[in-house]
């Protein structure tokens, strides 16, 4: 592994570090929201479940952004699309700070999710198409831990600034790092795989991309806008409108529909795993009576564990195989649940958060390599992002469900967190065990 990393040249390191920075700062902007559920609920005089809908619409909008921006990346290149995506979601992050009502915040977070959806798939493709195959396992773990690093940064900013600047100030702070990542991408060269295939692609292959993009945006905004107009719950509208339309996107990958459907199901389980253990954990800690500093510190410790687990299992997947690395990590998470969800002291909860973070992100550390190795080469800009973000869409209602379940149990989040982690870990182990693997596949050539 170390030998393959030493063989990477400046172009390959540049693409890897840029993709990592983009995903880290994307996640930073997303996770700022989860620390502020109670503060936003208090300002707008609603319950926490109503505010969690803002995160639900963000997740539900992401696959439509992934599809649209992925198509643009397959047509115009990875690098320019990534820069546009970062500028867009930075703008909507800033606008969120000035939301006059919860309704306005819901719509802004849907726009944010649509823009954010374009980052992961395109960024991962740029990196995976640029680096040597033998470095892919470690780089996969490294890239995916950008999400944990973003969460860690959000925890630290919450710890240091929230009591001074409030939730609106937090959104303003969130803009600056994202703009820095856009500047980083200006120094990155285009994917060699895209450059090699530029002259072999059919001129009409993406001719309807802009029309499809408008449709995708309208669908992404539908749950938030229709909820405001009709009073129906956001979750109901997500599964009634976004989910069927999102799954219809499989038609664009109809030549590979079996693997696309399998990976969408797998990524639904993975997103249930990550968001089900991360998004409400700060709220859970607050419900136990811990203050801003204690919540921020415990969450930061959990994300240090996540970074360690992702790097370790990403690298080990080169020996264990992609599937077994994910299975082992999911199995470990089950053993950690009692310490993570039912401890009574901050020290034990922080230790549990470290171990759960390592287990959950250990399984996630394999995902960028696994998806890109299984993706068809002619749509690698769109395919990994689509199946990943479809998982986000299908899992998006979980956070509202967990908050509602906790409310029904007198505000105790322990049961909701524990049942989610246990059931989903078993589900992942089963899905991955019977799935395919193409470890070490050549991503620089066209697949038949």
Give the residues covered by each predicted segment.
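Extracytoplasmic gate region of multi-pass secondary transporters
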Residues: 33-34, 213-307, 395-399
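Helix-breaking motifs and short loop linkers at transmembrane-helix boundaries and internal kinks
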Residues: 45, 77, 98-104, 132, ...
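Helix-loop-helix hairpin linking two adjacent transmembrane segments in secondary transporters
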Residues: 143-186, 204-208, 224-236
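Structural signature of the two symmetry-related core transmembrane helices
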Residues: 80-94, 324-339
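Cytosolic juxtamembrane N-terminal segment immediately preceding the first transmembrane helix
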Residues: 1-30
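Helix-to-loop junctions at the C-terminal end of transmembrane segments
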Residues: 66-77, 310-321
């Amino acid at each position: 592994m170390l030998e393959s990393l030493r063989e990477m040249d400046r172009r390959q390191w540049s693409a890897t570090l840029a993709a990592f920075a983009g995903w880290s700062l994307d996640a930073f902007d997303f996770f700022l929201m989860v620390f502020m559920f109670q503060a936003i609920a208090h300002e707008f005089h609603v319950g926490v479940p109503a505010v969690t809908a803002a995160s639900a619409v963000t997740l539900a909008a992401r696959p439509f952004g992934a599809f649209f921006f992925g198509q643009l990346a397959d047509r115009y290149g990875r690098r320019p699309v990534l820069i546009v995506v970062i500028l867009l979601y930075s703008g909507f992050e800033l606008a969120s700070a000035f939301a006059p009502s919860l309704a306005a915040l819901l719509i802004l977070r849907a726009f944010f999710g649509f823009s954010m959806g374009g980052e992961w798939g395109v960024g991962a493709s740029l990196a995976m198409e640029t680096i040597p195959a033998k470095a892919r396992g470690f780089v996969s773990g490294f890239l995916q831990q950008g999400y944990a690093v973003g969460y860690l940064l959000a925890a630290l900013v919450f710890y240091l600034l929230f009591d001074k600047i409030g939730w609106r100030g937090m959104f303003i702070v969130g803009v600056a790092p994202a703009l820095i990542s856009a500047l980083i991408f200006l120094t990155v060269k285009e994917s060699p795989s895209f450059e090699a295939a530029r002259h072999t692609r059919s001129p009409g292959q993406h001719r309807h991309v802009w029309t499809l993009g408008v449709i995708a945006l309208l669908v992404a905004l539908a749950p938030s806008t229709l909820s405001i107009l009709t009073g129906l719950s956001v979750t109901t509208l997500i599964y009634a409108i976004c989910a069927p339309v999102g799954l219809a996107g499989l038609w664009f990958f109809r030549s590979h529909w079996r693997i696309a459907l399998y990976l969408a199901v797998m990524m639904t389980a993975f997103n249930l795993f990550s968001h089900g253990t991360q998004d409400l954990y700060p709220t859970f800690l607050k419900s136990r009576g811990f203050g801003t500093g204690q919540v921020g510190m415990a969450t930061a410790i959990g994300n240090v564990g996540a970074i360690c687990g992702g790097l370790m299992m990403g690298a080990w997947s080169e020996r264990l195989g992609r599937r077994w690395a994910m299975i082992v990590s999911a199995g470990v998470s089950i053993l950690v649940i009692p310490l993570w969800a039912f401890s009574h002291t901050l020290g034990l909860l922080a230790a549990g958060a470290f171990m759960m973070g390592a287990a959950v992100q250990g399984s996630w550390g394999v995902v960028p390599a696994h998806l890109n190795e299984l993706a068809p080469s002619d749509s690698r800009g769109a395919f990994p992002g689509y199946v990943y973000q479809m998982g986000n869409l299908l899992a998006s209602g979980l956070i509202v469900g967990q908050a509602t379940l906790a409310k029904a149990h007198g505000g105790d989040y322990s049961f909701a967190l524990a049942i989610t982690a246990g059931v989903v870990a078993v589900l992942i182990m089963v899905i991955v065990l019977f799935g395919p693997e193409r470890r070490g596949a050549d991503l620089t050539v066209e697949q038949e």
